[in-house]
Amino acid sequence: MPEVIPKPKRAYRKTSETQQIIFDTAMTLMSEKGFQGTTVREICAAACIPVGTFYNCYKSKVDILRRIYDEGDAYICGSISREAEGLDAIGQLRLFSEYYARLNEQTGIEVLRVLFYPSNEWFSMNRPMQVFIRKVVDSGQRGGAIRSDLSADGIIDCLFDILRGICYNWCVCNGAFDLSIRIKAHMDLFCAAITT
């Protein structure tokens, strides 16, 4: 009896390639029409795939955005944890902001424009990035480096208001300023405001 060669790797490769085609097509359409203005049918038509194939790769259009956030969380949390060792809380916040700026620069203006839509649930979720920052702020408050008269939640909200606001403005201004430099300047002000 001849040996049967399994095909999962090839099927996986096809699925992975199809997911990437769908993702790239969706990002292009969403950059032009926005998240809300782009339908799954339009994505499938532009990618030349059946609608069923889309749903084999993604549960919904929202899953495409989830991929961006998951990759961002993995990048920041995976990279920063090694470098953050030995830094005080303020140093860790500054390091986080550098990685956040770098991530958004790498993500690019077109994709960021897709992410900034009013009902984006991930802006209010307790993502790994926010969990990391929560640990930094809690540690900084316990150690006396960060003001304790402000709530940790308030500090974290303020930090993400600043970071997201700068990224949003970067998109509106079509990348007319250096994102990393702008974030660093605002982080200097933010850190001065929360330091004891």
Locate the predicted segments by residue.
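Conserved hydrophobic residue
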Residues: Q36, I146-R147
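Hydrophobic alpha-helical connector segments
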Residues: R67, G78-Q106, I156-L159
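C-terminal peripheral helix-coil segments that are non-catalytic and often amphipathic
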Residues: M1-P6, G86, R102, V131, ...
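Amphipathic alpha-helical packing segments from all-alpha helical-bundle domains
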Residues: A74-C77, S119-A145, D153-D161, Y168
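Short hydrophobic/aromatic patch on the recognition helix
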Residues: A47-Y58
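Basic, helix-initiating cap at the start of DNA-binding domains
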Residues: M1-K33, R41-A46, D63
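Short linear capping/connector segments at secondary-structure termini
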Residues: L112-N120
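Alpha-helical DNA-contacting segments of helix-turn-helix folds
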Residues: Y58, I64-G72
